[in-house]
Each structure stands twice: as C-alpha cells, then as structure tokens.
Design a protein with these regions (language model features):
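Charged DNA-binding/catalytic regions of mobile-element recombinases
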Residues: 1-291
C-alpha cells in the first residue's frame, strides 16, 4: 500500500509531503491513515515481521521464504502461509541467496564403477556417502575444502581444509567420517567424481582398508555428484562469497563454525522434511529404538 511506503520513506528521512507528491497521494489522506488504529491483521503482520527478521538474521541472511516459513511452522509453531511470509519479507527487503557454479578439478580415468547412477537415496545412515572438493580465495592464496556427506540425512560427517590439493586433503576428510560414524565394513558406498585425489592410491587404499565401497561418476558430469554440488553451492553462497577473506586461518575457522554450529545442527533442508540433519538422524534413531 502506498501509505505504508510513505511511512517507510519518512523513517528513512524523506519528507512526508515530498513522498506523497512523488507517489501522487493525498498528504491529508496519509495522516488520516496513520492515525487510524491498526487492524488485527496489521498487528499480527507486525508481530510476524519481527519473527521473520529474527529468523533471517539467525540464518546469516541465507534463508528465503520457504525456509523462513519452515522455521516458523516447525521451529516456533506459528501457523501462517508461505505467500504471506514472502510478502512480509518483501516489505522488509529480505531475501535468500542464489547459487553460482564453481570450478571443477582435473579428471582422470575411473578406478571404481558407478554404483550410484544418480540415485541419491539411502534408507538409513552410513549407506551412501558422497565426497568432493571446493576452493575459495583469500589474500594469502587459495583454500581447498574436502567434505563427506551422508545422503540419508544430508549431514556432513567428515571434512578437511588445506592450502593444497594433494591426496591427503580427501583422505583426511574420509578419516574424520570413519572416526565419527564407524560404519560396518562392506555396507557403505563412497561416491566421488574422477578428480586425481580420488583416483589416487592413498585414497583407494583407505577405502579398501576400511571396507568401504568406492564409486565414481562420469567425467565432467556435475549431475553424477549433484548433492555435493548442491552442498558446496550452499557453502559458497551462505558463507564464502559474502565477504573477502584475509587469511586462510580466518576462512578455515569460519567453515568449521558454519558446518558444526549451523549446517549440521540447525539449517533446515526441504529434502528431509524441513528438519536439520542432526534432528533428522535423531528421529531415525528414535524410530529404530521404538521398533
């Protein structure tokens, strides 16, 4: 409504008469509207707007209307429509972040068959892990991050950060995943692209020693590891691309905090019923215990 826009402009320092003249509305009409008691709907909208602003800030400015709506509904028990949330976010000039593609590493011939074939589904934790590498610049030089994602819950179960692309980068991420999850031998597929780190002897040796089943997608096909592409796109958008990083240590600390304090325990995912990975796994464990 034009009157609300006048009020917002006035709050920003624009004279009411000037705003009314530009918008071609009556100044007296604006003052009359301003003095009216707010309707019940307007009061409810103001209360909802305050919660929306709080949730958007909690998400580090990353949530769009769908996830803000999910947090209201599931996290706070607020009943409201997604379109209403989107409208109020527009009034607050809030929006989520949007994805861009990153660079791909050099590919080599596969040393494992493709056991996944783009079927990114799992009926329990530790059935299917995906792994990949991303990079990001700092003033000191590039930082490389390898991560291991459990398809069942979208949880990052292992990760590592380094200033190089040697095989130990991906081996360290795998070792963290093994230490945290302790999967039984012969039951967990580890799917990657054909980057030289994943075709290396060191990575293959760790897979075999742990009884993990290696799997590789085709050359140059992002769709063959789409969930990892999606995760790293989210990491870039919600954290890495939002500022310039001075040091590798600064960036590494931020990635640690984002994964362990935000993404795994709190960030909601539409693919897992708008729950966080930790909460989704907790429900799974409760269901198994009750069975």
């Amino acid at each position: 409504m034009s009157y609300r826009l006048v009020r917002e402009l006035a709050a920003d320092g624009v004279h009411v008469a000037v705003a009314c003249r530009v918008l071609r509305i009556s100044t007296s009409g604006y003052y009359e509207w301003r003095e009216r008691p707010p309707s019940a709907r307007a009061v409810a909208d103001e209360e909802l707007r305050a919660q929306i602003v709080e949730i958007h800030a909690m998400s580090r400015g990353s949530y769009g209307a769908p996830r803000v709506h999910a947090e209201l509904r599931l996290g706070r028990g607020v009943r409201c429509g997604r379109k209403r949330v989107a409208r109020l976010m527009r009034l607050e000039r809030l929006q989520g972040v949007y994805r861009r593609r990153g660079k791909r590493a050099r590919k080599t011939p596969a040393v494992h068959d493709d056991l996944v074939r783009r079927r990114f589904v799992a009926d329990a934790p530790n059935r299917l892990w995906l792994t990949d590498i991303t990079e990001h610049p700092t003033h000191e030089g590039k930082v490389y991050c390898a991560a291991v994602l459990d398809v069942y819950s979208r949880r990052i179960v292992g990760w590592s950060i380094a200033d190089h692309l040697r095989a130990e980068l991906v081996v360290d991420a795998l070792e963290m995943a093994r230490w945290r999850r302790r999967p039984p031998g012969g039951q967990t597929v580890v799917h990657s692209d054909r980057g030289s780190q994943y075709t290396s002897w060191a990575f293959g040796h760790r897979l075999r020693a742990a009884g993990l089943l290696g799997s590789m997608g085709r050359v140059g096909s992002a769709a063959d590891n789409a969930l990892m592409e999606s995760f790293f796109g989210t990491l870039q958008l919600e954290l890495l691309d939002r500022q310039r990083w001075s040091t590798r240590r600064e960036l590494a600390s931020a990635v640690f905090e984002w994964i362990e304090a935000w993404y795994n325990p709190r960030r909601r995912h539409t693919a897992i019923d708008d729950l966080s990975p930790v909460d989704f796994e907790r429900l799974h464990a409760a269901a198994v215990d009750a069975a």
